Amino acid sequence: MKRIFFPMALLVLAILACEQAGTSTPPRTDPPPTPAPDRLAAIPPDAVKITPETDVYPVKSETDEYADPVPLPFPVNTTGAEDSAFMMPNGKTLYVWFTPSPGIPVEKQLFDGVTGIYAFQKTETGWSDPQRIWLQDPGKAALDGCEFVLGNTMWFCSAREGYTGMHWFTAEFMNGTWQGWKDANFNPAYEVGELHITADGKELYFHSPRAGGLGEYDLWVSQNVDGVWQEPVNLVSLNSTFNDGWPYVTQDGSELWFTRTVGAPELWRSKKVNGEWTAPQKMFAPFAGEASLDPEGNVYFTHHFYTDNVMLEADIYVAVKK
């Protein structure tokens, strides 16, 4: 799970926003050009690729339902840091957040030209080269992530020029590109963190540190009534005194996957029975988080590589359903 919105990035953007205080960026109709980003050249030359064989804390399946996870091949994974995988329901398009190195200061990520969201297409022989997803006007600063797609709408979180702090935005897929980005206008009192909206558009699941929870982050759900998200309800049956967040709900609404941090991040799953979420079960650990599933039930997620409490790299892994 990425941590891209640090105080330094917000400070930089707050300075940029001073001249535009009280304003917001109107939606674009003319998308910016999308030159091929040279993300590989931005990776530090001394970066060393970590493999399952050299991983100090290899991630394992905790059940017989899934095989042990394995990393996706290049070009999805590199010696840089890949995070926040989101698989489209067709099982063919994979969105991934990339930065050249987890050690790069966030204020440099903001302006490096390559940190951001990329899309890969699954082919018969592997994965396509990445397509950079541009969600800001040329020449304006933004640090985008947390991508979630439903239909032709993308929700993404962003710290960007013209705004104070982090906000949720939406963009529409039109004429082969993402454009028309605008503020998502969630009720600020809800404190919406990373989110997932059910396939029918009726429920918004998200994590938040808002009052009334059990841990630092708790899972919450809000109902959509006539286009308005209602007061969130705490998912008491799923939450713990640990960090619980980064929800993902399967297309049929029968499973809710989330990340629980118990020393290190772990992936947990709850099944819905008779309309209620059952006690969650640990599925993958350690350093496993932010799940997304394809139509076959295979799980894509982020695995971080640590040594002596220092994060060296991050990759996207997949666990195949048996």
Question: What do these predicted ranges mean?
Answer:
Residues 15-17:
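C-terminal motif of bacterial Sec signal peptides marking the signal peptidase cleavage site
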Residues 1-4:
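Positively charged n-region of N-terminal signal peptides that target proteins for export
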Residues 24-32:
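Ser/Thr/Pro/Gly-rich low-complexity linker/stalk segments immediately outside membranes or between
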Residues 19-21:
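Bacterial signal peptide processing site
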Residues 31-322:
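Short, conserved micro-motifs composed of acidic
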